[in-house]
Amino acid sequence: MASVSPLAKFKLVFLGDQSVGKTSIITRFMYDKFDTTYQPTIGIDFLSKTMYLEDRTVRLQLWDTAGQERFRSLIPSYIRDSSVAIVVYDVSNRQTFLNTSKWIEDVHRERGQSNVIIVLVGNKTDLVEKRQVSISEGEDKGKEYGVMFIETSAKENFNIKALFRKIAAALPGVDSYSLATKSDDMVDVNLKTTSNSSQGEQQGGAGGGGGCSC
C-alpha cells in the first residue's frame, strides 16, 4: 500500500490594532462575505482551511487576534510557532499604521527575522476620501522592515485573493499557487487568477465608500 504524505500545515496569525479589519479579511477569504455589523474579536479566534495546490495539499490555520490592549499578553504565544504573520492597518487611520512597527517588532522578537514570513497589509482602501496613509508609505515601511506589502479592501473584495496568493507563493516548498478548497470544507476557494477576477480586484480599490469599512 502506498504511503500517505502528511498534510503540510501552516499557521497564519493576523495582527494589528482594533478595528483595522483583520476579521473582515478572514471572513471575506473564507466565506466571500462582508459583515457590516462590527463585533470586536475577544481573545483569539481560529479557522482552518484545507487547500489543494498543484503539487500537494496544505492546511492553513488562520488565527485572528484581538487588537485591544488588554489581550496583548496572549498574542506572543501565538506568534511563537507561526509560519506567517499578517500585520494589518487601516489606511484611513494613521495611528494604526504607525503602530505596525510595534507589531512587526513583536514578531521579530518572538520568531527572529528570518524564520517567519511577514506581510504588511493596508486595509480599507475603499475609504478613498478618508485615506491618511499613502501607498508609497506602506511600500516604504515594507522595504524598511524587509517584509511583503499589499493593500486590500475586505468590503470591496479588493486584493483579498491576491494577498493569499502572495502568502501561498512564499510558503516553504510551494512552487505553484493555484488553490482550491474541498467542497465540504466551508467554502470553495480558487486563487487562480482569471481575467474577470483581476478586473474586479483592480476596480475594487477605485470605488469610494463612506461609513465603517473593515
UniProtKB/Swiss-Prot annotation:
GO cellular component, one term: cytosol
Pfam families: Ras
GO molecular function terms listed in the Swiss-Prot or TrEMBL record: GTP binding; GTPase activity
UniProt binding sites for GTP: 16-23, 64-68, 123-126, 153-154
SUPFAM superfamilies per UniProt: P-loop containing nucleoside triphosphate hydrolases
Residues spanning the membrane: none
Membrane topology per record: Lipid-anchor
PROSITE patterns with a match to the protein in the record: RAB (PS51419)
Ranges where the record places region Disordered: 194-214
Localization (cell): Golgi apparatus membrane; Cytoplasm, Cytosol
Record has Transcription regulation as a keyword: no
Official protein name in the record: Ras-related protein RABH1c
Organism: Arabidopsis thaliana
Organism taxonomic ancestry: Eukaryota, Viridiplantae, Streptophyta, Embryophyta, Tracheophyta
